[in-house]
Amino acid sequence: MSRIIKSMLRAGVFGVSASAGLVCAQVSDNTFSGKAALFSEYEYRGISQTSEKPAVQLNLDYAHKSGFYVGTFVSNINWLKDTANANGFTSNANIEWDIYGGFKFDVAKDVTIDIGYLHYEFPSAGAFIPKPNTDEVYVGASYGPAALKYAQSTSNTFGVENSKGSSYIEFAVNYPLPAMPKLTINALVAQQKYKNNGFLDYTVSKIGATYDLGAGLNVGAYFKNTDAKKVWYTVDGKDWSKNRLVGFVSYSF
């Protein structure tokens, strides 16, 4: 059993997932959009949230032409239930429900700044102390296919005690191939750091591809790699930080 589970760790988005940041075409003052996806596994920042099991996810977003946006994300999870079982008690906490909002604006040609807030909510997680619910503020900048993002928690981070002020930084590139514009190469490198809990820090990298099937459908896969210390991320023999191939299909509407 992982020792960090005593502190209720949850860590670990690539391409499509819970990270805030709306991507949709502005065709009017107000734009509503959504995305439904099926993943072979829900991993977040390199760490499995579903104990290597599939996940069904939904994003709903609103954006105004001023740059303001707000949205929500829902996914099934297993890490809280597995943590409870590993520690001898029962939990029905099998849902993650996030709410995010912010403001995007252009500062130069092809350069966009994104500033916002993200709240991670875990309904039915009342048995866990400290609470896994987490608040983060973030700032990002994108130029063409490249994007840099920094996030910092304003609360304890995913239940880790005394971890307010933890940080996450990532650099991602999503590059459509000129010869095959429907095929996008995705690459990411990031680092998660836990305030006052440095033994949990790790780096994650991901490389993969997404193919646009048309009519809002996309399929893709990527390989994720972390250097997280296995002893802190293993529950009942399952290493949540294990290097794995993840596949997905999504529908945007």
Positions of predicted regions on the chain:
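Residues that define the transmembrane beta-barrel architecture of outer-membrane proteins
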Residues: 30, 52-56, 93-97, 131-137, ...
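Short glycine/proline- and aromatic-enriched beta-strand/turn motifs that initiate or cap beta-hairpins
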Residues: 26-80, 84, 244
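Detector for outer-membrane/organellar transmembrane beta-barrel domains
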Residues: 132-196, 224, 251-252
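Cleavable N-terminal export/targeting peptides
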Residues: 1-31
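Surface-exposed loop and membrane-interface regions of Gram-negative outer-membrane beta-barrel proteins
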Residues: 68-131, 236
